[in-house]
Amino acid sequence: MKLAAVVMLALLSGCAAMQGSAERTQASTMDIIAAAAAAAPEGVVGEYQLSIQAAGTDGRAVYLNTELDYRDQRNITIAMSPAVAAALAGTDTASAQQYFVGKKLLVKGLARRMKIDFLSHGKPTGLYYYQTHIRVKNPEQITLLSDRAA
C-alpha cells in the first residue's frame, strides 16, 4: 500500500513537472499531444520536429497538419496568418499552403490542446473534440529541416 502511494506521488509529480512553459524538444507527435493534454489549458513550450502532410486555410489563417485528416486525433496543427505563411514560402498565400506539404519542419512555440466545437447553423451543438495547435506568429518560429517529410 505504501509502495502504491509512493508510485502515485511520483507519477503526479512528473505530471506537474510537465505543465507550464517548460522548454522541450520532441519529435513524436503523440509525445507532443500527450504533453499538451497533460499541461492543459496552459500548453507546453518547445521546439518540435513535424512532418507536414496537408494544408488548408479558412481565409483568416493557414493550417499545416501532420495528418491528412486534420480531425485525426494523432494530428498536430500549425496555425499562422496568411502573411506569415507567404513570408515563409516566399510566395502568395494560395501557393504557400502547398509549399509546406511534404516538408519536415522545426517549429518553436506553445503546443496547446484546443477545444473544437461542432457547429450547426453557426451555433455550438454541445459536441466537441480536441486538437493540438501550435500558433506561429512570426517566420522565425519555423525552420525547414528537409524537403521530404520523413
Q: What is each of the regions a protein language model found here?
A:
Residues 4-12:
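Sec-dependent N-terminal signal peptides
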Residues 18-150:
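OB-fold single-stranded nucleic acid-binding module
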